[in-house]
A protein has these predicted regions:
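Active-site beta-loop-alpha junctions enriched in small/polar residues
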Residues: 11-15, 35, 59-61, 82, ...
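Glycine/Thr-rich beta-alpha phosphate-binding loop at enzyme active sites
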Residues: 60, 70-111, 149-152, 156
Length: 172
């Protein structure tokens, strides 16, 4: 399809049986939801031969402790800041505290190499707060980059860059 690395967020049931249909590349990030399968570790294992970065997505209501048993299987966590389904939602207030809990868990369990991606209502203000907490990948959408008209997209990207939101290298 493309040589550009993709960030694939799979919101599908039993994703482990569908990976071969997608065309996953070594440079891709693939996020599966904790709730999408009864066999989370197996699903993450099935991703390993593709050589991609394996991320686990957790919804706002998913407790942080579910990460404890999968940290050895993942390269990153996709922390949803809104309930999945549609653009334009406001951030779920408890997710800022949840981001702090995730960072604390990673440190406590000696897994600081696991990166945290945040998705949902990533406004300029929220991106700055989440960067301070420790998030390193930001899914920018209608709250930042795609605000306003098409001519303004470049300026919106510059505004995010101005926040000095730097992506941690996940290849280390």
């Amino acid at each position: 399809l493309t040589s550009i690395p993709l960030d694939l967020h799979l919101m599908i049931k039993d994703p482990e049986y569908k990976f071969q249909w997608i065309g996953i590349q070594e440079t891709d990030i693939v996020s599966i939801h904790y709730e999408s399968t009864f066999q989370v570790q197996r699903a993450l294992d099935y991703l390993q031969p593709f050589g991609c970065k394996r991320f686990l997505a957790i919804n706002p209501a998913t407790p942080v402790y579910v990460l404890e048993e999968v940290l050895d299987y993942i390269d990153g966590i996709n922390l949803l800041m809104v309930n999945p389904g549609f653009a334009g939602q406001k951030i779920v207030p408890s997710t800022m505290k949840k981001a702090e809990k995730v960072m604390h868990l990673l440190k406590e369990m000696h897994h600081e190499e696991v990166v945290v991606e945040v998705d949902g209502n990533i406004s300029y203000e929220n991106a700055a707060k989440l960067r301070k907490i420790g998030a390193s990948i930001f899914v920018a959408g209608s709250s930042s980059v795609f605000r306003g008209d098409v001519c303004g997209y470049g300026n919106n990207i510059k505004k995010l860059r101005f926040l000095k939101v730097e992506q941690k290298n996940i290849d280390d």
